[in-house]
């Protein structure tokens, strides 16, 4: 090709490109919604700002979590949507939610109705509450207090779901594994994978983690274990159970049978469960056939952005089969060291909308309750104080919850707001790390949660 032809071809390309930019809005329907950059951005290498409220900027932000667990957090920075929830009505999946201001922030009205309706059935069927959270709920903290109140009020027995391998002792049951009648450590038991935490503990190509976000794999190296359960401390309703369910793949045998659920011979407080075969175990539930069952599912180091990485069918089937009427999400604390600007706070809050929507699709008959982080302490210029953005984080999580038709409880405000963690430390309710509660503090937080929830139920 001759040089003048090459030059002519290049000029034609620029003319065509300029024409596309000029008529960008007119041609967008024919381009499948593609947005053309401004012509100046093409030459300068910069993308012009887009005013469309539906546009999203997605970044992968490396995040060092408070629990010393590294992961990458997908953050969608959408200032317009984050601020838009100040309005009084929102349309979510063709449903309008009326919003009111409360002592715990903006709240959508009627969003606990499905849970409250479910409680009316607790006398004749099982009603389930699934409590997900970060390390603040480890050891069954907060959950156990809420469970006790709910079971005392509406009936129900048992601690609910337990992982096959328990590495973090709980305040409710003593649990360990036996192989050939010998007690073994978690390292000596089946291989485990987690949807949260370090990458080397996650599965390479499968999203089968079950309802708890973790799976124990029985294989030729470990194909038979006995799970031992006995009560811990003072007996409560959570230590009695009359029904067993094992959530596992079909080839797993429970006490030599392929039947994975059924009534026990009596109401028990201790049990040995023989589990064998080649397959996967997602959880073991000790429960009753009626009343309220409350599951404690801590995800150490988690920010709450993992549910969309889990298997949709497994979650959907579990929530439907167990009549799950309330899903509690208690997250946000682990992102505070990173969320040191308002933009980052809004980005994290917006990212949680995707998780809420996903869980609502999986559990259409359940209410969703988001619990924000507690007050948390850091050191600024040598002085111990609350994280500077903790109040803003609480506000933004309340707003996105209202926008998504999700209930919100502010643990931060229930504690007393900014600086309250120091007060709780002085009262012996919180640890010296300025993040976690002692058991007494977790009991108090659980009581405050129940008092708030009971008012909602009675209203």
Language-model features and meaning:
Residues 7-25:
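Hydrophobic membrane-insertion alpha-helices, especially the h-region
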């Amino acid at each position: 090709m001759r040089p003048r032809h090459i030059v002519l071809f290049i000029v034609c390309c620029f003319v065509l490109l300029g024409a596309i930019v000029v008529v960008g809005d007119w041609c967008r329907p024919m381009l499948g919604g593609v947005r053309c950059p401004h012509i100046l951005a093409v030459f300068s290498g910069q993308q012009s700002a887009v005013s469309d409220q539906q546009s999203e900027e997605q970044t992968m932000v490396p995040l060092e979590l408070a629990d010393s667990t590294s992961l990458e957090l997908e953050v969608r920075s959408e200032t317009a949507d984050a601020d838009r929830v100040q309005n009084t009505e929102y349309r979510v999946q063709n449903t309008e939610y009326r919003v009111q201001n409360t002592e715990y922030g903006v709240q959508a009205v009627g969003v606990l109705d499905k849970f409250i309706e479910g409680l009316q059935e607790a006398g004749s069927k099982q009603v389930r509450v699934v409590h997900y959270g970060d390390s603040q709920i480890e050891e069954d903290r907060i959950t156990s207090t809420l469970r006790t109140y709910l079971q005392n009020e509406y009936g129900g027995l048992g601690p609910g779901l337990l992982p096959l391998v328990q590495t973090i002792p709980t305040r409710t049951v003593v649990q360990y594994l036996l192989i050939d009648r010998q007690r073994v450590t978690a390292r000596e038991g089946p291989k485990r994978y987690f949807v949260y935490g370090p990458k080397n503990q996650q599965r390479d190509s499968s999203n089968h983690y079950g309802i708890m976000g973790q799976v124990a794999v029985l294989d030729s190296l470990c194909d038979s274990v006995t799970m031992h359960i006995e009560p811990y401390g003072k007996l409560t309703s959570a230590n009695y159970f009359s029904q067993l369910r094992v959530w596992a793949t079909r080839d797993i045998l429970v006490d030599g049978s392929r039947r994975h659920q059924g009534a026990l011979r009596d109401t028990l407080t201790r049990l040995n469960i023989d589990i064998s075969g080649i397959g996967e175990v997602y959880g073991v539930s000790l429960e009753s056939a009626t009343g309220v069952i409350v599951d404690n599912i801590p995800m150490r180091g988690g920010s709450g952005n993992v549910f969309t990485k889990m298997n949709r069918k497994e979650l959907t089937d579990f929530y439907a089969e167990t009549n799950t009427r309330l899903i509690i999400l208690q997250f946000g604390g682990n992102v505070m060291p990173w969320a040191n600007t308002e933009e980052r706070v809004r980005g994290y809050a917006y990212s949680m909308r995707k998780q809420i929507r996903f869980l609502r699709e999986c559990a259409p008959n359940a209410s969703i309750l988001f619990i924000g982080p507690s007050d948390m302490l850091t050191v600024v210029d040598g002085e111990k104080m609350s994280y500077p953005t903790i109040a803003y984080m609480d506000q933004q999580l309340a707003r996105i919850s209202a926008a998504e038709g999700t209930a919100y409880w502010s643990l931060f405000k229930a504690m007393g707001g900014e600086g309250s963690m120091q007060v709780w430390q002085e009262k012996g309710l919180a640890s010296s790390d300025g993040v976690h509660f002692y058991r007494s503090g977790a009991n108090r937080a659980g009581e405050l949660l129940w008092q708030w929830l009971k008012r909602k139920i009675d209203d």
